[in-house]
Amino acid sequence: MKLEKDRDVLSLKGVSVRYVDSTVALHPTSLDVKQGEFLVLLGASGAGKSTLLRSINGLVLPTKGEVSIPGLAGGVVNAKTLREHRKRCGMVFQQHHLIGRQSVLRNVLMGKLGDRGAFASLWPWSKKDKLEALTVIERVGLLEKALSRADALSGGQQQRVGIARALIQKPRILLADEPVASLDPATAHSVLTLLHEICKKDHLTAIVSLHQVELARSFADRIIGLRQGAVVFEGRAEQLSPDVARNLYAKQSNASNTSASTDSPRTLQSSQTKELLPC
C-alpha cells in the first residue's frame, strides 16, 4: 500500500522510558512524522536518541505512552503487532552488525529473512531474491563488491551494505542510529548524501540520529533536539540557532548523565525490553 504524500506515518503519544531504579531515559515525548520526511534526532551521547529510536522500532517498549502506526493492526505497536511493525521498519546501525566472513550479497539478503518462513530459511536463496539484492547493492554503489567478504570493506562501504540490507526489506520507515558516528567527516558526508538521496527518490520516511550539528543542518527536513532524555528543540534546520545548538551539548550533571547515559535495554524494566535484533 502506497501512503499519500504528507500523511502521518508515525505518531508518538506521551512515550516515556524509565530504568529499574526509576531514573528517566526518555521523558514523555509526543511527535508526528510525515511520509517522506527526513527527520534528524540531534544531541550528545546519552541524550536519549537511541532510546527514542528503539521505542519506535519496538526494541524497547515504552514505560508509558504509545507508538501509533496507520495501517498496523490495532494501529499501535505492542507485543502482538511487533513482528508486523518490524517488517515495515528498516534499521541501520552504527556498528553495521554485518557477518564479516560472508559476502556483501549474503549480508544484504539477511534483510529478507523476515519475509521467509521458518522452514524456507533452510533453503538456498532464489534467483529472484539474489537479483533483488544485487539491485539494492548497485543503488549503494557496491555492485563490484557484491561477492567480496564484508570484513574486507572499509567502514564507509560496510555502512552502505547496512543501508542496502535495510532497503531490501522495502520498509515504510527507515531508522538509522548514529549511522556515520564512526566515519571520518568526508566519508560521513558521502554516506549521508547517499542515504538522503535514496530516501528522497523513494519518498521514504527516515528518522536518523546524529550528534554532528552541521550534518543535521545539511540534510534534515526537521530537527528534534534532545538533551537529558527530553525534547528541547523542534524545528527546521534553519531555525536551529547557535545558542540552541550549544545548549544541546552543555555539560550535564552526573545525575542527569546517569538517567540517559546508556540506551541499553539490559538496564530497563524487564517487561519493557525486547531482544536486540535487526528489523
Curated annotation (Swiss-Prot):
Q: Which cysteines are joined by disulfide bonds?
A: none
Q: Name one Pfam family in it.
A: ABC_tran
Q: Where is this region: Disordered?
A: 253-279
Q: Where is the ABC transporter domain?
A: 10-253
Reading the lineage from the top rank, the first entry is: Bacteria
Per its record, what are the GO molecular function terms? Answer: ABC-type phosphonate transporter activity; ATP binding; ATP hydrolysis activity
Catalysed reactions, as listed in the record: phosphonate(out) + ATP + H2O = phosphonate(in) + ADP + phosphate + H(+)
* Entry GO CC: plasma membrane
Subcellular locations according to the entry = Cell inner membrane
EC? Answer: 7.3.2.2
Provide the residue positions that the database annotates as binding ATP. G43, A44, S45, G46, A47, G48, K49, S50
Membrane-related topology note = Peripheral membrane protein
Q: What are the protein's UniProt keywords?
A: ATP-binding, Cell inner membrane, Cell membrane, Membrane, Nucleotide-binding, Phosphonate transport, Translocase, Transport
Renumbered to this chain, the Polar residues biased-composition regions fall at 263-279
Database matches in InterPro entries: AAA+_ATPase (IPR003593), ABC_transporter-like_ATP-bd (IPR003439), ABC_transporter-like_CS (IPR017871), ABC_transpr_PhnC (IPR012693), MetN_ABC_transporter-like (IPR050086), P-loop_NTPase (IPR027417)
- Could you tell me where the Low complexity compositional bias lies? 253-262
Q: Which PANTHER family match?
A: AMINO ACID IMPORT ATP-BINDING PROTEIN, PHOSPHONATES IMPORT ATP-BINDING PROTEIN PHNC
Q: How does it assemble?
A: The complex is composed of two ATP-binding proteins (PhnC), two transmembrane proteins (PhnE) and a solute-binding protein (PhnD).
Job description of the protein: Part of the ABC transporter complex PhnCDE involved in phosphonates import. Responsible for energy coupling to the transport system.
Q: Which family does it belong to?
A: Belongs to the ABC transporter superfamily. Phosphonates importer (TC 3.A.1.9.1) family.
> Mind telling me what this protein is named?
Phosphonates import ATP-binding protein PhnC 2
Q: Which organism is it from?
A: Cupriavidus metallidurans (strain ATCC 43123 / DSM 2839 / NBRC 102507 / CH34) (Ralstonia metallidurans)
